[in-house]
From Swiss-Prot:
Spans through the membrane: 8-28, 30-50
Coiled-coil ranges from the UniProt annotation: none
Species assigned in the record: Desulfitobacterium hafniense (strain Y51)
Topological type in the membrane: Multi-pass membrane protein
Keywords in alphabetical order: Cell membrane, Membrane, Transmembrane, Transmembrane helix
Family: Belongs to the flotillin-like FloA family.
Listed name of the protein: Flotillin-like protein FloA
Entry annotated with the keyword Transmembrane: yes
GO CC terms, sorted: membrane raft; plasma membrane
Length: 333
């Protein structure tokens, strides 16, 4: 059954009105606007609409603004929105400003926003300025002049320096510098007993070096938590050096032995070479004698005299060899 247009028109208008109201309440955070008015914060409807158009969540701006207004801070909507669009944490910055205000720490919004955009936790920095933080260093090994190793563990009490949070070094630098100072201080000690008797000497020496320069912290104190005696590094190094010297000496002795063996073989070869030359020279003697006899330079009697001399020499050699062999076979008891 078809309803008359006079009956349908009010229903259509009511539906359109409900849709329009729902769209308005969805696009315009009326509840947030009412909360701001109740808190005494002047935020216009069109300001909230502009936030929607700029893809800014109004609650991320209005709630911190209400908090800052109640804390007595002079912060504008434009400042908070600009920091939000830059990728900052608006709520954390406002909390840091409130904490700094309560602790009487001078901190402006621009400075807090810069610290937050630099990746630092500005709220933690303010809290650390009020309540210093204790940093425990890992075990640091150092060797005194007498060669004894000491293993030291220290506690460093630091306070955040808000003025140096942007661009200042972090905790890792503090730990590295303290470890370096401990190694230097122990290394300059004559013996490890002095360090064990007076460990605060190390902490005073390290603290006097100004290790917090260029960092985001101010070192309040350095306390030696634990000192343990380690290895005798000096004796170990001496042992290693002696072993190395021994190996070097053995290598040099082996080199000299090899050179002596090579020299011996060289001399044997040289003797064989000389013997070959003697044999070669002896083979020329008969030819020379024949030449001398033929040319009349050597007489027959001279030749026989030389033969007698050679026979006597050979006989003496045989007698000498026989005497030596008898002596070797019958040694004296």
């Amino acid at each position: 059954m078809n309803m008359p247009i006079e009956v349908l028109m009010p229903i259509i208008l009511l539906a359109l009105a409900l849709i329009l109201i729902s769209v308005v309440f969805t696009f315009i955070p009326v509840g947030l606007w009412i909360s701001a008015l109740a808190a005494g914060v002047n935020v216009g409807i069109f300001t909230l609409v502009g936030m929607r158009l700029r893809r800014v969540t109004p609650s991320r701006i209005v709630n911190p603004l209400i908090k800052a207004h109640k804390a007595g801070l002079r912060v504008t909507t434009a400042q908070l929105e600009a920091h939000y669009l830059a990728g900052g944490n608006v709520d954390r910055v406002v909390n840091a400003l409130i904490a700094a205000e309560r602790a009487a720490i001078p901190l402006q919004f621009e400075r807090a926003a810069a610290i937050d955009l630099a990746g630092r936790d500005v709220l933690e920095a303010v809290q650390m300025s009020v309540n210093p933080k204790v940093i425990e260093t890992p075990v640091v090994s150092a060797v005194a002049k007498n060669g004894i190793e000491l293993r030291v563990k220290a506690r460093v009490t630091v306070r955040a320096n808000i003025d140096r949070l942007v661009g200042g070094a972090g905790e890792e630098t503090i730990i590295a510098r303290v470890g370096e100072g401990i190694v230097t201080s122990i290394g300059s000690s004559l013996s490890h007993e002095k360090v064990l008797e007076n460990p605060d000497m190390v902490s005073r020496t390290v603290l006097a070096k100004g290790l917090d320069s260029g960092t985001a912290f101010e070192i309040l104190s350095i306390d030696i938590a634990d000192v343990d005696v380690g290895k005798n590094i000096g004796a170990q190094l001496q042992t290693d050096q002696a072993e190395a010297d021994k190996r070097i000496a053995q290598a040099k002795a082996e080199e000299r032995r090899a050179m002596a063996v090579a020299k011996e073989q060289e001399m044997i070869a040289y003797v064989q070479e000389m013997r070959a030359k003697v044999v070669e020279a002896e083979s020329e003697v008969p030819r020379a004698l024949a030449e001398a006899l033929k040319e009349g330079k050597l007489g027959v009697m001279d030749y026989y005299t030389m033969q007698n001399i050679m026979a006597d020499t050979s006989m003496r050699d045989n007698i000498a060899r026989s005497s030596n062999s008898n002596t070797d076979s019958n040694p004296k008891k």
